[in-house]
């Protein structure tokens, strides 16, 4: 119930985070999320980690969101990854440690000893070295006698099976603490010096007082490199112990082999206590037996905290993680170089080199035996602290590799970049080995072997990192490959290229409507179609879906120019058949008249025309379809001519109805208005005016004065007797304008300028207005 309620609360807070952009509200919701008991299942189901991680660049709540994501990263289990990484690491490191690796360390001692001896001697006193020896030897004594015989039998039994160049679990553990499994050759080199050093811890008490400067140099390096990798101080202890390995007498080798396993157990126990102290935050005073051990562990814990505390803050931010990782890689490589040189700072003249060669395989065999026994499950006790140590180290060193899967980030990209780093460090290691080989002639063979080992290692690591990146390249090839059509050979007979496979994809678009009726219905009905409404916007551009043959091109030209075909010569009917099928009956008849040879072949074409124009007619006996069509066509034309003649004769014999008659036949017609205005303007209307107006005698003056004028105007060609005739006349309304017009057209009087009607109206209004005042 509690898990379900927490899941519901997380979902509600996640929804509020996505909906509310207020910084105060966001901070409030993030604080509530930090209080809730979040589990890995809740993170996977809700995806709240991705939501909170999206606020890491926010101005107000960015720091709190990064801290919360870093806190949730600790919840993610990395046991599976750590076990798989340990196995991969051991496989990569196997058969890569030559027996004469210790010889190179001894050669480097002399060059580095003189430069560091004065500075190292003033750091600590011999008592401090003795305290360190006590601190390292006290936890080992209870285990020394109990496990000596058992581990010796296991070592003998596994010595028969294991190869001479196998990797030890202790070195692989420490190598895993410092870096991820695809480690660099510098780390491999430091592990070589680390593996035999762990078996030589009790020998420090038997060393001479003259070797104090190596202890002080190691202590000074442990203090100066607190900001470096978490295992800096422990690795310097081991390097210091390896510097005195050659000084030990030959008769103490058996004691060293017996006490090697007990010391490894003590180191694992101390590392287990250190990891628990880092996780729980408890003090180290309850865990360790002596006060000197407390001080040393506190110093190591502070160095680890200084390193891992910024690493957790930076791990949530991918942009800042990569530069810091590069800086740590550079610092680690520099420290490894110093440690390799610093191992030889306190070395004097000891046993010859063959003794060192004998010791290296023995320690490797003993530790290989321990690996085999752990794999068989015989020693479950020592395996448990190592698993816890790898879990703790993975939690601090590589939290993003497992937590990013919950945030749906991409992992192969980081693996690819790590491979590049290992290859670059491999080149630097190769250069270092070549310098060492030039310094002495004894180590020439070993210097030639190590670059080969490094090359093999880089070749193994690069495929391991390149394999996860291969699926990223597959989706990029989205474009389909074009068909690889080879160019045809040039021949006299031309053949076109085959049509592409992409052409059929255009055909469904062209055949959207199978008939004009469907297209018309789709365009003008009320229902919607999947495609747009077909609207005619001009003829579309004609295109050829494929290359046409020469024969097809010629037939196409002939179909488009049938009216230009006359004599075809000796061209057979089979060639012209597609063209003749497109001909109308008139065009076909004309071509046959020009080419009588085709008449025998075109009977089927005339049959088609007969069925189309004369559906119910059948040919007579011994009559071809062509003859039938011509006969029926002539009969139809004759009927049409007869019908036309009948209609024409019917219209000719029809009685005429109303006829149009001219008005003013016996009088002068009134000219149109525009003509009259032009006549008045230019004085061209005087031709109709008589030259001399004759006035009737006095008896007729008593009547209308307009009558003689009208008579004279209408009969100006008549004699004076006719003027005396007082016959019927038209109305006076018509005569008055005629008389006035005759008077106005008098050329003896000047033409009066007529005022426009609108102007006359305006002038009249002005006169009436001014007259009232």
Curated annotation (Swiss-Prot):
Residues 4-79 form the TFIIS N-terminal domain. Keywords: Acetylation, Nucleus, Phosphoprotein, Transcription, Transcription regulation. This is Elongin-A. CDD domains: TFIIS_I. Heterotrimer of an A (ELOA, ELOA2 or ELOA3P), ELOB and ELOC subunit. Part of a multisubunit ubiquitin ligase complex consisting of elongin BC complex (ELOB and ELOC), elongin A/ELOA, RBX1 and CUL5. Interacts with ERCC6; the interaction is induced by DNA damaging agents or inhibitors of RNA polymerase II elongation. Interacts (via BC-box) with CUL5. The modification N6-acetyllysine is found at residue 430. Disulfide bonds: none annotated. GO terms for biological process: transcription elongation by RNA polymerase II; transcription initiation at RNA polymerase II promoter. SUPFAM superfamilies: Conserved domain common to transcription factors TFIIS, elongin A, CRSP70. The modification Phosphothreonine is found at residue 390. The lineage of its organism: Eukaryota, Metazoa, Chordata, Craniata, Vertebrata. The keyword Ligase does not apply. Residues 234-247 have a biased composition (Basic residues). The gene is Eloa.
């Amino acid at each position: 119930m509690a898990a379900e309620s927490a899941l519901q609360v997380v979902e509600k807070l996640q929804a509020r985070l996505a909906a509310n952009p207020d910084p105060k509200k966001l901070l409030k919701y993030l604080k509530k999320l930090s209080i809730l008991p979040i589990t890995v299942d809740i993170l996977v189901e809700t995806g709240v980690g991705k939501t909170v991680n999206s606020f890491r660049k926010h101005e107000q709540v960015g720091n709190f969101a990064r801290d919360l994501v870093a806190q949730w990263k600790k919840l993610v289990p990395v046991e599976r990854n750590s076990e798989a990484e340990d196995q991969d690491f051991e496989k990569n490191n196997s058969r890569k440690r030559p027996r004469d690796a210790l010889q190179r360390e001894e050669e480097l001692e002399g060059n580095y000893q003189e430069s560091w001896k004065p500075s190292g001697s003033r750091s600590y006193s011999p008592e401090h070295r003795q305290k360190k020896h006590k601190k390292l030897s006290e936890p080992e004594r209870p285990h020394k006698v109990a496990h000596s015989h058992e581990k010796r039998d296991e070592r003998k039994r596994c010595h028969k099976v294991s190869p001479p160049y196998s990797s030890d679990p202790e070195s692989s553990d420490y190598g895993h603490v410092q870096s991820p499994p695809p480690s660099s050759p510098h780390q491999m080199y430091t592990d070589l010096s680390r593996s035999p050093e762990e078996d030589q811890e009790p020998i420090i008490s038997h060393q001479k007082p003259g070797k104090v400067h190596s202890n002080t140099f190691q202590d000074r390096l442990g203090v100066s490199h607190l900001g470096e990798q978490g295992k800096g101080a422990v690795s310097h202890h081991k390097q210091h112990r390896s510097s005195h390995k050659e000084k030990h007498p030959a008769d103490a080798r058996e004691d060293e082999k017996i006490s090697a396993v007990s010391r490894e157990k003590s180191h694992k126990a101390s590392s287990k206590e250190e990891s628990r102290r880092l996780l729980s935050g408890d003090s180290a005073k309850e865990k360790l037996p002596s006060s000197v051990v407390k001080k040393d562990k506190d110093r190591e814990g502070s160095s680890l905290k200084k390193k891992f505390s910024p690493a957790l803050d930076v791990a949530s931010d991918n942009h800042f993680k990569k530069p810091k990782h590069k800086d740590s890689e550079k610092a680690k490589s520099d420290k490894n170089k110093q440690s390799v040189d610093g191992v030889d700072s306190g070395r004097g003249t000891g046993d010859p080199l063959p003794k060192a060669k004998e010791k290296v395989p023995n320690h490797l065999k003993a530790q290989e035996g321990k690996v085999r026994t752990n794999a068989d499950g015989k020693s479950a006790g020592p395996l448990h602290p190592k698993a816890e140590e790898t879990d703790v180290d993975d939690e601090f060193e590589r939290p993003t590799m497992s937590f990013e899967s919950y945030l749906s980030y991409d992992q192969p990209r980081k693996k690819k970049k790590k491979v590049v780093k290992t290859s670059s460090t491999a080149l630097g290691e190769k250069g270092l080995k070549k310098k060492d080989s030039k310094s002495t002639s004894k180590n020439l063979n070993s210097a030639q072997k190590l670059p080969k080992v490094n090359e093999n290692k880089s070749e193994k690591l690069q495929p391991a990192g390149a394999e996860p990146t291969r699926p990223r390249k597959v989706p990029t090839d989205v474009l389909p490959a074009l068909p690889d059509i080879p160019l045809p050979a040039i021949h006299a007979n031309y053949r076109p290229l085959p049509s592409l496979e992409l052409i059929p994809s255009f055909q469904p678009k062209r055949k959207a409507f199978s008939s004009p009726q469907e297209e018309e219905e789709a365009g003008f009905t009320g229902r919607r179609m999947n495609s747009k409404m077909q609207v005619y916007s001009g003829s579309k551009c004609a295109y050829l879906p494929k290359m046409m043959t020469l024969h097809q091109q010629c037939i196409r030209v002939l179909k488009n120019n049938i009216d230009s075909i006359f004599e075809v010569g000796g061209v057979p009917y089979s060639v012209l058949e597609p063209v003749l099928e497109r001909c109308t009956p008139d065009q076909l008849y004309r071509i046959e008249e020009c080419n009588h040879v085709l008449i025998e072949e075109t009977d089927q074409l005339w049959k088609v025309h007969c069925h189309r124009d004369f559906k119910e007619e059948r040919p007579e006996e011994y009559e071809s379809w062509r003859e039938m069509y011509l006969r029926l066509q002539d009969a139809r034309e004759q009927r049409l001519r007869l019908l036309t003649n009948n209609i024409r004769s019917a219209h000719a014999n029809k009685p005429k109805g109303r006829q149009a008659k001219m008005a003013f036949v016996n009088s002068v017609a009134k000219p149109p208005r525009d003509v009259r205005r032009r006549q008045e303007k230019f004085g061209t209307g005087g031709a109709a005016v008589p030259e001399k107006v004759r006035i009737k005698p006095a008896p007729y003056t008593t009547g209308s004065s307009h009558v003689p004028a009208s008579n004279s105007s209408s009969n100006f060609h008549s004699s004076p007797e006719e003027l005396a005739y007082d016959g019927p006349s038209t109305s006076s309304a018509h005569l008055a304008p005629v008389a006035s017009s005759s008077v106005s057209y008098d050329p003896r009087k000047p033409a009066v300028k007529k005022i426009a009607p609108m102007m006359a109206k305006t002038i009249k209004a002005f006169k009436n207005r001014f007259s009232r005042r």
